[in-house]
Amino acid sequence: MLAAALRRCTAAAAARGLLHPVSAPSPAAAVCSIRCYSHGSHETDEEFDARWVTYFNKPDIDAWELRKGMNTLVGYDLVPEPKIIDAALRACRRLNDFASAVRILEVVKDKAGPHKEIYPYVIQELRPTLNELGISTPEELGLDKV
């Protein structure tokens, strides 16, 4: 039944002249598209960090933007710098979102992967912020044993 409906729609579109054969792009267009992607400025590590710190320091950030930012940041092949995590934790505190703060710390531990020295370093750098904001680590909450 669906196939018959699709054939009728295709036949009607062809009768009205809406279906045109797609021509292959010319070789010049293919070369141009390749060249267009080879240029552009590359973001330095400092610019990357500043962009994310600014994002999380927005005074009007809401819970959705916080989660979107963290999901995007986690998608990169890196462990975020402590100053980015600090800004994200402060955003969680402004939103009174303790669960997201703990989840951010869990994600940092997960992103560190087999490099066991990264997560303790990040926690060491964030310890003053964690104490100031009253945020417990997943280990302090016993979540690492679950």
Swiss-Prot record:
<comment type="pathway">
    <text>Energy metabolism; oxidative phosphorylation.</text>
</comment>
<keyword id="KW-0349">Heme</keyword>
<comment type="subunit">
    <text>Component of the cytochrome c oxidase (complex IV, CIV), a multisubunit enzyme composed of 14 subunits. The complex is composed of a catalytic core of 3 subunits MT-CO1, MT-CO2 and MT-CO3, encoded in the mitochondrial DNA, and 11 supernumerary subunits COX4I, COX5A, COX5B, COX6A, COX6B, COX6C, COX7A, COX7B, COX7C, COX8 and NDUFA4, which are encoded in the nuclear genome.</text>
</comment>
<dbReference type="GO" id="GO:0006123">
    <property type="term" value="P:mitochondrial electron transport, cytochrome c to oxygen"/>
</dbReference>
<feature type="modified residue" description="N6-acetyllysine">
    <location>
        <position position="109"/>
    </location>
</feature>
<keyword id="KW-0597">Phosphoprotein</keyword>
<dbReference type="GO" id="GO:0005743">
    <property type="term" value="C:mitochondrial inner membrane"/>
</dbReference>
<dbReference type="GO" id="GO:0046872">
    <property type="term" value="F:metal ion binding"/>
</dbReference>
<feature type="modified residue" description="N6-acetyllysine">
    <location>
        <position position="83"/>
    </location>
</feature>
<protein>
    <recommendedName>
        <fullName>Cytochrome c oxidase subunit 5A, mitochondrial</fullName>
    </recommendedName>
</protein>
<feature type="transit peptide" description="Mitochondrion">
    <location>
        <begin position="1"/>
        <end position="37"/>
    </location>
</feature>
<dbReference type="GO" id="GO:0005739">
    <property type="term" value="C:mitochondrion"/>
</dbReference>
<keyword id="KW-0007">Acetylation</keyword>
<keyword id="KW-0999">Mitochondrion inner membrane</keyword>
<comment type="function">
    <text>Component of the cytochrome c oxidase, the last enzyme in the mitochondrial electron transport chain which drives oxidative phosphorylation. The respiratory chain contains 3 multisubunit complexes succinate dehydrogenase (complex II, CII), ubiquinol-cytochrome c oxidoreductase (cytochrome b-c1 complex, complex III, CIII) and cytochrome c oxidase (complex IV, CIV), that cooperate to transfer electrons derived from NADH and succinate to molecular oxygen, creating an electrochemical gradient over the inner membrane that drives transmembrane transport and the ATP synthase.</text>
</comment>
<keyword id="KW-0496">Mitochondrion</keyword>
<keyword id="KW-0479">Metal-binding</keyword>
<keyword id="KW-0472">Membrane</keyword>
<feature type="modified residue" description="Phosphothreonine">
    <location>
        <position position="137"/>
    </location>
</feature>
<keyword id="KW-0408">Iron</keyword>
<dbReference type="InterPro" id="IPR003204">
    <property type="entry name" value="Cyt_c_oxidase_su5A/6"/>
</dbReference>
<dbReference type="GO" id="GO:0004129">
    <property type="term" value="F:cytochrome-c oxidase activity"/>
</dbReference>
<feature type="short sequence motif" description="SIFI-degron">
    <location>
        <begin position="2"/>
        <end position="16"/>
    </location>
</feature>
<keyword id="KW-0809">Transit peptide</keyword>
<keyword id="KW-0832">Ubl conjugation</keyword>
<dbReference type="GO" id="GO:0045277">
    <property type="term" value="C:respiratory chain complex IV"/>
</dbReference>
<dbReference type="Pfam" id="PF02284">
    <property type="entry name" value="COX5A"/>
</dbReference>
<dbReference type="InterPro" id="IPR036545">
    <property type="entry name" value="Cyt_c_oxidase_su5A/6_sf"/>
</dbReference>
<comment type="similarity">
    <text>Belongs to the cytochrome c oxidase subunit 5A family.</text>
</comment>
<dbReference type="GO" id="GO:0031966">
    <property type="term" value="C:mitochondrial membrane"/>
</dbReference>
